[in-house]
Amino acid sequence: MKNEKTYKIGTLTYTTTGIILLSIWMLWGDLIWSLKDRAVGPSSTLLFKQIIDSEFLYGLIIIAFPNFTNIFLQPIIGFVSDRHRGRLGRRIPFILFTTPFIVLGLYGLAFTKLFGSWLHGVCPSLSLSAAQLIFFGISWVFLDFGSTLAASLFTALANDVIPREVIGRMFGLFRLVSLGVGMFYNYCLIGKVESHTMWIFFGVGTAYGLGLLLLCLKVKEGKYPPPEELPPLPNGKKRTILQTVTTNSVIYFRQSFSMAYYRWFIVATVIANLAFMPINGFSIQYSKALGIPTDDYGKYVVFSYCISLFLSYFLGVLSDKFHPLRTGIASQLVYAVLMFAGFFIMINPKAFSYIFILHVVISGCFFTFVASLNSRILPQGIFAQFISAIGIVSAAFNMIAGPVIGKIIDVAGDYRYTLLLSALISTASVLLLYKVYRDFLKYGGDKNYEAPMPE
């Protein structure tokens, strides 16, 4: 036992047994988060399309609105949680805070049709679709508020408690769990969403509430150095609330965006993630336009997830070995070629099945490769703050991109343009990631890299 290998991160020390137990509970948390994440997107899309058929409104409400709230909410939660020191740690208290909002939002979506029908009966001048859209919107606001705040917290918690020696593998396992949940949803549930909306959303909401509570009880954070204190005012005066908010905002934006290295990294990360939005956001509608049954669409997803499931752990190992920047660039390059080719050939159900499966597999490879990239590049002391800064820029891009893509499809009447857009964005991401890679080498590369700390 004396020679048992130990793993350290901050004040936390794990034996091999401890790492296994940590892995179990973090994977449990990822299972619950993935269930919510995998189910909400497609289920909300199908529910929304049952209520009203407008790609512009879909892009505005489902895509643009969450990204608009990201701009304001993620910086707050990132900045505050980085500097919070409490009995339960700096991430877990905020995870607990967000959970009721997510559960209420999911329950609201479950009863959207029921409440909407009731409102239409009470107020006949309001159409049934408008009444249901009102309740959908209210529930979506609750769900979005909680999800936006929680999105970066789980990643930040993983960054705080998982030792660097195993973080790539751990994120590979996270990906494996996420894919498994996606397979279950798309094989067993997606074909039933339109007829069993209430039970699916209600079940996911209940599982999320109980599951996240258990995660917060079982995972323990370490001790953190005291946060940087605000400089004193002249004559020892106390700051007003407005002065405190203003000073913290200046610190936030200075630290997050003052260094060119991190500005390039943020933009590269955002553009790389944006490359998959055109297909991910409109693939269900594309399949329906080609006459593909929803069950068949779900089977394509399940098959592609089976491939990704097999690859996920090994991709994590490759990421640890070759660095996420290199593997991320390679996967984006392959994806760009696929999308350019797909634009010319994806014109019938058979072509859709092949290109869509490859899209899911290759985009999945990218996300697995770069899952630990933020932990390998960003300063640990203000990690969640940087994640939120990425979220701000990502939200700004996505907020514009969602409705624009929807409008392009409405005008062109052809979903094939989603592939061309993905190809162009992916090509841009390759160039941006290569720029970041060159700067990474200047700061020490694989052996001597230390994340530079902004002043």
Regions found by a protein language model. Give the residues of each.
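Glycine-rich segments within core transmembrane alpha-helices of 12-TM secondary carriers
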Residues: 69-71, 168-190, 391-402
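Structural signature of the two symmetry-related core transmembrane helices
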Residues: 91-107, 326-341
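A membrane-interface helix-boundary motif in multi-pass transporters
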Residues: 90-92, 191-206, 407-426
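Helix-loop boundary and gating motifs at the non-cytosolic
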Residues: 3-69, 261-268, 272-290, 297
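Intracellular juxtamembrane helix-capping segments at the cytosolic ends
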Residues: 149-162, 365-379
